[in-house]
Amino acid sequence: MVKIFIDPGHGGSDTGASANGLQEKQLTLQTALALRNMLLNEYQNVSVLLSRTSDQTVSLTQRTNAANSWGADYFLSIHMNAGGGTGFEDYIYPGVGAPTTTYRDIMHEEILKVVDFRDRGKKTANFHVLRETAMPALLTENGFVDNTNDAEKLKSSAFIQSIARGHANGLARAFNLSKNAAALYKVQIAAFRTKANADSLAAQAEAKGFDALVIYRDSLYKVQIGAFSSKENAEALVQQAKNAEFDTFIYQE
């Protein structure tokens, strides 16, 4: 059993970065909850614990103590950035070697495959959550809330889902997680070779009330609006999508 500890940065009285109508503490929690659901619903032999599951104040020491006491195999701290930049970057503790560096390289690559952010690079820092954890640890900074372009992306629930998906893909690859045997019925409305086209259609679907997710697989950006264990539920969503004038089909995976 692989034990993944997910740390949504900030929370409660600690808002984190705030700009353009966004609060970091809300974005990190949304991303972490989506990531947890992906891992637990889609993969075998993985256990997930979050440092917080609501808007509560949790100290840095409480976060690392919880991960250490639980015996986590990996500590993942999710953040959004501020300070005038743009894009994605991640951090590990200075001077550490494998497997921390190996996991970081995989996570960095998989996140940027599906998240439309500029690559700001792989960095090191003496952050508490990287220093005081007894297992490999990574802190990701997913866009700048004070950058207009980044902020517009972060306001989209579909984009938050894509951030979570990138993290999930990275964890699955880093820890060789196996997919659940039970196939899901997935509802897809399109597939594109360019991410911009997929993001545009996802935004259109979201505007019509669908939960859209852009997934990069088989060299295509696929726009998915649902995944179900029941084929009947998938077919019901297909009809809703067709009524909204989307070309839709179901596939199993």
Curated annotation (Swiss-Prot):
Recorded superkingdom: Bacteria
Catalytic reaction annotation: Hydrolyzes the link between N-acetylmuramoyl residues and L-amino acid residues in certain cell-wall glycopeptides
Start and stop residues of the Sequence repeats: 184-219, 220-253
Domain MurNAc-LAA: 4-172
Keywords recorded for this protein, A-Z: Cell wall biogenesis/degradation, Hydrolase, Repeat, Secreted
A GO term for molecular function: peptidoglycan binding
Domain SPOR: residue ranges: 179-253
Catalytic EC class: hydrolase
Listed GO biological process terms: cell wall organization; peptidoglycan catabolic process
EC annotation from Swiss-Prot or TrEMBL: 3.5.1.28
Region (2 X 35 AA approximate tandem repeats): 184-253
Gene3D superfamilies hit by this protein: Sporulation related repeat, Zn-dependent exopeptidases
Statement: the UniProt record of this protein carries the keyword Hydrolase: yes
Database matches in InterPro entries: MurNAc-LAA_cat, N-acetylmuramoyl_amidase_3, SPOR-like_dom, SPOR-like_sf
Coiled coil: none
Gene Ontology cellular-component annotations: extracellular region; outer membrane-bounded periplasmic space
Disulfide bonds: none
Annotated localization: Secreted
PANTHER family: N-ACETYLMURAMOYL-L-ALANINE AMIDASE, N-ACETYLMURAMOYL-L-ALANINE AMIDASE AMIC
Family of this protein: Belongs to the N-acetylmuramoyl-L-alanine amidase 3 family.
Role summary: Hydrolyzes the cell wall of M.luteus more efficiently than that of B.licheniformis and B.subtilis. The C-terminal region, including the repeats, determines substrate specificity.
Protein's UniProt name: N-acetylmuramoyl-L-alanine amidase CwlM
Record lineage: Bacteria, Bacillati, Bacillota, Bacilli, Bacillales
